[in-house]
Amino acid sequence: MTKVEYKHTEIAVKKQLGQNFLTDRNITRKIVRLSGAKPEENILEIGPGFGALTKEIIEVCPSFTVVEKDPKLAAFIRTEYPQLNVIEADFLKIDLEAVTGARKLRILGNIPYSITSPILFRLLEYRRCFMHATLMMQHEVAMRIVAVPSTKEYGILAVQLQAFFDVSYGFRVGRKVFKPQPGVDSAVITITPKEHVPLSDPEGFSRFVRCAFHQRRKTLLNNLKESYNLDAVPSEVLKRRAEALAIQELFELFKEMKPKMLS
């Protein structure tokens, strides 16, 4: 069992929580600069751990909210930074609307590898609650988020997020700046909810994307024919694969889709 100790607080690292603690202050400063955080803003940090990033955010914004699932780490943050609002809970289960209040959130976090995708889809669900997020995650996942069409990384994650967010790759973070050291590098990305998305049915679009990419080597015709009436779609379009279509092309294709009624 790996144990990490900081300021007389020792915890057994929980692999199921994906706990890897950042140790390089140059990286945390860079994350806060990239976030654009300002003193008057409503800031939320996901998973502060031992407060490496927290310490730098405080330099900009003396009081803000953190969400920490681990009881021992939540207690540590309360003691170390009594001015902060500590929510001891699973980020995937909290009501972000209640946390937001009257002001949209600016979110920062070194998010656990094990729940990166669930956190991203949670942010997608609550996209009206925040103005910007700066997140560190596994490098491979970051590359999938910012991927472009006709690349192996381009898939459901890229399309779902890029449809509703402006996404940007910040910088790579080597594995040696974490304790315990993970087996892969990390990266920092930013996501900003788009002001306007040309979709009247976002949930329907999400279902369509999952169908279109269900088997990525198959054509749109083969992936969609069981779930949608394709009569209005040109045959040359149906011969293509979903991975070759840009976001706007997928928007336009979705508008032509008519879901089949279940018998």
From Swiss-Prot:
It catalyses: adenosine(1518)/adenosine(1519) in 16S rRNA + 4 S-adenosyl-L-methionine = N(6)-dimethyladenosine(1518)/N(6)-dimethyladenosine(1519) in 16S rRNA + 4 S-adenosyl-L-homocysteine + 4 H(+). Its EC number is 2.1.1.182. GO terms for cellular component: cytosol. It is an enzyme of class 2 (transferase). Keywords: Cytoplasm, Methyltransferase, RNA-binding, rRNA processing, S-adenosyl-L-methionine, Transferase. S-adenosyl-L-methionine binds at residues 20, 22, 47, 68, 90, 110. It is found in: Cytoplasm. Disulfide bonds: none annotated. InterPro entries: KsgA/Erm, rRNA_Ade_diMease-like_C, rRNA_Ade_Mease_Trfase_CS, rRNA_Ade_methylase_Trfase_N, rRNA_adenine_dimethylase, SAM-dependent_MTases_sf. GO terms for molecular function: 16S rRNA (adenine(1518)-N(6)/adenine(1519)-N(6))-dimethyltransferase activity; RNA binding. Specifically dimethylates two adjacent adenosines (A1518 and A1519) in the loop of a conserved hairpin near the 3'-end of 16S rRNA in the 30S particle. May play a critical role in biogenesis of 30S subunits. Belongs to the class I-like SAM-binding methyltransferase superfamily. rRNA adenine N(6)-methyltransferase family. RsmA subfamily. This is Ribosomal RNA small subunit methyltransferase A. The gene is rsmA.
